[in-house]
């Protein structure tokens, strides 16, 4: 993090008017200075219902089928859902990672390690792949358990059902 920016933020927090409420959001709060964190109250925001995110996307002009898919993929996070609308490459990368997973499942160990080695060279891509794969395995485990919880990867329902069937 940039020290000058962090110090400016700290000064803003310390000198804010008494009536002011500042909301600070961070994807990686561990990168904030401890002095900043100590002056904040941490609120963990829960995702919105999928239906609310879907309705918001429809209101913004997204067709119903796409809005439903993006709302599920977003996991109830409206900001992420809007980014999925604005940046089609996010959905393309997600599909790529899920296709990679399908290819790797029956692959030989050497191919899996080769893929892992390639992925380890790009930390952002690795983090992205792990996040996407975790959502996929979450869906599989929900189906194995017989839970009625909505899937994140609704567009992969047939694959998920098939894999869940093999695991029971």
Task: List where the protein language model places each region.
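Conserved AAA+/SF3 P-loop NTPase catalytic/coupling segment centered on the Walker-B
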Residues: 1-10, 29-33
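Conserved catalytic/switch belt of AAA+ P-loop NTPases
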Residues: 7-21
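Charged, glycine-rich active-site and insertion segments that engage polyanionic ligands
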Residues: 18-21, 27-132, 136-137, 143-168
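Short gly/ser/thr-rich secondary-structure transition/capping motifs
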Residues: 4, 23-24
């Amino acid at each position: 993090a940039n020290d000058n920016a962090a110090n400016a933020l700290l000064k803003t927090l310390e000198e804010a008017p008494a009536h002011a409420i500042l909301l600070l959001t961070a994807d990686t709060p561990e990168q904030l200075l401890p002095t900043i964190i100590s002056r904040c109250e941490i609120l963990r925001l829960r995702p919105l219902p999928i239906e609310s995110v879907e309705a918001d996307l429809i209101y913004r002009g997204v067709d119903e089928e796409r809005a439903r898919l993006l709302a599920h993929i977003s996991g109830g996070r409206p900001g992420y859902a809007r980014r999925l609308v604005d940046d089609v490459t996010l959905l393309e990368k997600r599909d790529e990672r899920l296709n990679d997973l399908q290819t790797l499942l029956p692959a030989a160990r050497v191919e899996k390690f080769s893929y892992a080695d390639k992925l380890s060279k790009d930390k952002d891509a690795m983090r992205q792949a792990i996040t996407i794969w975790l959502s996929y395995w979450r869906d599989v485990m929900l189906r194995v358990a017989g839970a009625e919880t909505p899937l994140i990867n609704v567009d992969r329902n047939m694959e998920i059902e098939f894999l869940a069937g093999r695991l029971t």
